[in-house]
Structure formats: C-alpha cells, structure tokens
C-alpha cells in the first residue's frame, strides 16, 4: 500500500529569492508527501554538496534544474516501486545511486528532497503526523527555541564578527509562552535600537543587524531588552552565541576585523570564557574553526563542563565526523542540519549517536528557508529539546514556530516543554 508510484521535482524560490528543490511523492494508496530543501549562507567545508547549475544567464548561476532533473529521472527510476515505509532502504539506495562520499554527483539537495518527501508520504499513509511517524509514541518534548535576534558575520553588513546572538526562554512553562517571551523581547529590542538611531531592518533569519562595534555591545542591548520586557536574564531567559569562527579563522589566528584584534586559539578560548562569565551565555556554537581541533580541545577543556559547546561546521551533521569528535573530546553538542548530510536516515543516526554519547542535539534551519516546517516535527520526533529557527519575523521562520505551537496543542497534557533541562549546564 505504501509503494511509491510517482516522483516529481520542481524549482521553487527560497527566502533569499534563490531557487531550491521541492519534491512531491505519491504512493499507491494516494498518500502524498512534499518537501522543500533549505540552503545555507555560511557553509562548512565538509558538508554534503548542494548542486547548483552554474549557468550565469539563469538565476545568476544559482539555478537547481540539474538537481530537479536528477530527481525526475535517476532518482525516480530508482525508488518508484519501493515501499515508502522502508526509509532506511530508500536512503541507502539514494546514497548508492549517487556513489560519491559527499553526494556531489546527484546533489544533496536532490537526495534530501526525495528522502524527506518519502517520510511525509509514509506518515500520511499511516494517518500520523510526521513527528509521531518518525519518533513513535515517545515523541512529546517541545524544544527550547534559540531565537536569533541580532546578526553579525556572514549574516549581516556590520562590524560584528560573531554571526548570531540568540535568546532562549528556558523559564517559560510552555512552548507557546516561550514564543510569546521571544516576541516581546524582539519588539522591545527593536524599540531600543530605534531609539538609539540604529537600523531595525531584519536579515535573512529575521534578526536585526545594527551597526554595533563588538559582541559585548550586542549582548548589552539584548540584556537590557530582556529586562525591559519584564523577564529576568539568567533565570527566565538565557543567551546563546553562534560565533561561526571558521569565517574569520585565518593563518592560525582569529581575525576580529570589526574589533581590529587578532586572537590565538588559546586567547579565543579565554575571550569566550570571559563572555560566558560576564553574561548568562549557556551555549556557544562554532566557537572555534572547523579544522582548529587544538582550539576546540582547549575550549572544551576550559568551559565544556559548564557551557554547551555546539559543533556545526565541526561536525556538519556527519556521523563519521561526529564519532571522531566524540572520541577526541571536542565540543559537547551537535547542531543538526538535514541538508548538511542529505538524508533523513543519516540525520537520525547522527542525533542518536550524539545522544548516546551524552552530547545534546540542536535541530536547525538554514539561512535560506521555505515554508516547509519539517524541522519542527523532527525536533519533537527526536526529543532533542532545542531548535534554532530564527527570529520572530519572516514567515519562513515563523512557519516552524507555528508548527511547534500546533504540535504542542495536539499533544495536549502529554506535551513537555524542555525548558532548563534541555541544556545540561542548567540541569
């Protein structure tokens, strides 16, 4: 009954106005699944390959027609007739069909679109929501949002070197109340920036990109806004950073262009430790460059016992890189981006590996998103307890928050908001 009978892909437009891949899957019983693929701005060197056409005369070279054709031809031929419920077999077939270690032949964007739409179709065939189909009866934990309200780095045109400054409403009783707190703080911050004559236009992920000189300047604005909105920093709301340090790691040092300062890996670790001591920062993502294993070890040894250290570029949701990082004692948390690895099965494998090793996992969007809300369901399915899906602006970000609100309502009394327990340092 769940045999795949039709596969169709198309080019659609993502939140940055660039083409991306959308895939429709139809099953023998009429069940239907659709998934759209996200795209990153700051990408790790070890991510699975997102295939772009490169034809400068169309979409400025960013078209994905080749990936769409791969789905409609090779991938369709390979998976039509297979059972959608056999997710791991289908994903293994897609990996084998591509035949490269980084999914570079067919494109991770082609493969992921097929993989996720298969899961959605199978869930519909079972008459189950996606989170329940993937996660089973134990899927009931609503994640704490990491809300990106000030942007710098590759996500902004300002001097701030760090890429994201986030709030986490850990003290809220429910996911809905966490979203409300985030919204109130977001609007309070907007007024504070406006009153100081700073820009309040929003970036790719819905956060502000004011012309501030340094990370402490951004953190001070956020702290004041939390308090003005009626919340207590460190209790109701804590802070998180995404340094995206790979972007400014040059010749063995961290070049803070905005501050005019260069820091060695040891000095970088000291700087981050100092920020975490001065502010209620409980999570730091990509605090070191993706290849600076020595720096990661220094940072983990220094503050890993009290701060969540999230590997994004370091691990790229890749079970092999994660296994090596666990073995070497690098970081203590995995950022999960489905398009970094390219199939649902490998994504779930990485999350399971992290959780077995005592690492936390954070489900994440990309800077180029669509209305697709799959990651909201996956956050609940895996009980990972944390999600990064942008600020409280832009419908491509709010689609995920709104889906989480619906899931919380649907779960009713069995819903559990992760709160402070999501981060071991706060437990």
Curated annotation (Swiss-Prot):
SUPFAM superfamilies per the UniProt record, alphabetical: Enolase C-terminal domain-like, Enolase N-terminal domain-like
InterPro entries xrefs: Enolase, Enolase-like_C_sf, Enolase-like_N, Enolase_C, Enolase_CS, Enolase_N
Record's keyword terms, sorted: Cytoplasm, Glycolysis, Lyase, Magnesium, Metal-binding, Secreted
GO biological process, one term: glycolytic process
Catalytically driven reaction(s): (2R)-2-phosphoglycerate = phosphoenolpyruvate + H2O
Gene Ontology cellular-component annotations: cell surface; extracellular region; phosphopyruvate hydratase complex
Required cofactor names: Mg(2+)
Chain positions recorded as Mg(2+) binding sites: 242, 285, 312
Intracellular or extracellular location(s): Cytoplasm; Secreted; Cell surface
Cofactor stoichiometry and binding remark: Binds a second Mg(2+) ion via substrate during catalysis.
CDD domains: enolase (cd03313)
A Pfam family assignment: Enolase_C
Binding of (2R)-2-phosphoglycerate, residues: 163, 337, 366-367, 388
Major localization class: cytoplasm
EC number: 4.2.1.11
One of the record's GO molecular function terms: phosphopyruvate hydratase activity
Active site positions, chain numbering: 205, 337
Protein function: Catalyzes the reversible conversion of 2-phosphoglycerate (2-PG) into phosphoenolpyruvate (PEP). It is essential for the degradation of carbohydrates via glycolysis.
Protein family membership: Belongs to the enolase family.
Protein name per UniProt: Enolase
Organism: Rhizorhabdus wittichii (strain DSM 6014 / CCUG 31198 / JCM 15750 / NBRC 105917 / EY 4224 / RW1) (Sphingomonas wittichii)
């Amino acid at each position: 009954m769940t045999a795949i009978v039709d596969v169709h892909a198309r080019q659609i437009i993502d939140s940055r106005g660039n083409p991306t891949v959308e895939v429709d899957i139809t099953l023998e019983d009429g069940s239907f699944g659709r998934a759209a693929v996200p795209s990153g701005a700051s990408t790790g060197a070890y991510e699975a390959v997102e295939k772009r056409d490169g034809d400068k005369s169309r979409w400025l070279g960013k078209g994905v027609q080749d990936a769409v054709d791969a789905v409609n031809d090779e991938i369709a031929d390979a998976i039509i007739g297979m059972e959608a419920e056999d997710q791991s077999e289908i994903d293994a077939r897609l990996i084998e069909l591509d035949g490269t270690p980084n999914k570079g032949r067919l494109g991770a964007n082609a493969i992921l679109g097929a993989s996720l739409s298969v899961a959605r179709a199978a869930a519909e065939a079972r008459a189950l929501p996606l989170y329940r189909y993937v996660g089973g009866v134990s899927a009931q934990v609503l994640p704490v949002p990491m809300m990106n309200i000030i942007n710098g780095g590759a996500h902004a045109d300002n001097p701030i070197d760090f890429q994201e400054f986030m709030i986490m409403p850990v003290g809220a009783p429910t996911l809905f109340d966490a979203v409300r707190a985030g919204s109130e703080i977001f609007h309070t911050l907007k007024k504070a920036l406006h009153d100081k004559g700073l820009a309040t236009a929003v970036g790719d992920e819905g956060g502000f990109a004011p012309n501030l000189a340094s990370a402490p300047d951004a953190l001070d604005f956020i702290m004041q806004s939390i308090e003005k909105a009626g919340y207590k920093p460190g209790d109701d709301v804590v802070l998180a950073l995404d340094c995206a340090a790979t972007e400014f790691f040059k010749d063995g040092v961290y070049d803070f262009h905005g501050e005019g300062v260069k820091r060695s890996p040891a000095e970088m670790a000291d700087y981050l430790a100092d920020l975490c001591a001065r502010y209620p920062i409980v999570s730091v993502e990509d605090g070191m460059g993706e290849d600076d294993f020595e720096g990661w070890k220094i940072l983990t040894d220094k503050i890993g016992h009290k701060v969540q250290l999230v590997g994004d570029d370091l691990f790229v949701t890749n079970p092999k890189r994660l296994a090596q990082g666990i073995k070497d004692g690098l970081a203590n948390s995995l950022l999960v981006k489905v398009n970094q690895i390219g199939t649902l099965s490998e994504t779930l494998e990485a999350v399971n590996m992290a959780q077995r090793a005592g690492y936390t996992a954070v489900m994440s969007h990309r800077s180029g998103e669509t209305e697709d809300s799959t990651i909201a369901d996956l956050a609940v399915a895996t009980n990972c307890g944390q999600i990064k899906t942008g600020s409280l602006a832009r419908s491509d970000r709010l689609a995920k928050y709104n889906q989480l609100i619906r899931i919380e309502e649907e779960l009713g009394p069995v819903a559990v908001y992760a709160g402070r327990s999501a981060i071991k340092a706060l437990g």
